[in-house]
Structures are given as structure tokens and as C-alpha cells.
Amino acid sequence: SVAGQAIGPDGCPVPLTIDLKGVNFDFDKATLRPEAIVILDEAIAILQKYPQLKVEVAGHTDSVGTEEYNQGLSERRATTVHTYLTDKGIDAARLVGPVGFGELRPIDTNDTSEGRARNRRTELNVQN
């Protein structure tokens, strides 16, 4: 195992980030796309396998629009994912947030439409 990495009840390392690549949003939207639901269902399976995991639900936007507007939009995106997880049986006590980071934490350039699309996302970040 890697130093500092949590070990699950089965003796296997616990993922430190639950990869939600594909839980991206259409421009100016906070609704889940069909492909996002598939990915969230996979994340739910991980959360069910590791009941000790706590995760932060973090929403993000691209840089189009005002910073204030994008902050609210990122919060709505995080809330959408948070609600989906709790509706599917994940205890809200295991979820930090929902938290919105607006346009402050891009993972790609905001200079291209492809980069902006990747920045319109929600992440689950393991907290323990």
C-alpha cells in the first residue's frame, strides 16, 4: 500500500478521489446528463463498498459569465449531485457540502470550447 493511503475493510487501498470524469454539465445548466448518471451510479457502488468514506461534493464552472454568477451555478451543480447521491441511499452525513468553487479551480484551459466543457464539472473528493 502507499504511505498515507487508507485501507478498506477488505484490505484493499481506498481510492482518494472518486473519478467522476464525464459528470460534466451543459453550458449554464445544473441538470444531470444521462452519461453522468451512469458515472454517479459507479461512484455510489464505491461508496457502498467503503462505508467509512466521506467525500466532498464540489461543483465547478468554466470562466464564461461573472464570477458571482458562476459561484451560484457551481453550487447548484454540486447540489444536484448531492441530491442524487442521497436519493440513492448515501447518508448525507458522509457528504461534505455541497460546495461550489465557481470558476476558481479549472482543470483545463478556458480558451477553447473543449476545455470549458471539461471545467463544467462536479467532483467527489475523499476526505478521510
Task: List PLM regions with ranges.
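Periplasmic peptidoglycan-binding/tethering modules of Gram-negative envelope proteins
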Residues: 1-55, 87-91, 128
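Periplasmic OmpA-like peptidoglycan-binding domain that tethers envelope proteins to the cell wall
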Residues: 34-37, 58-128
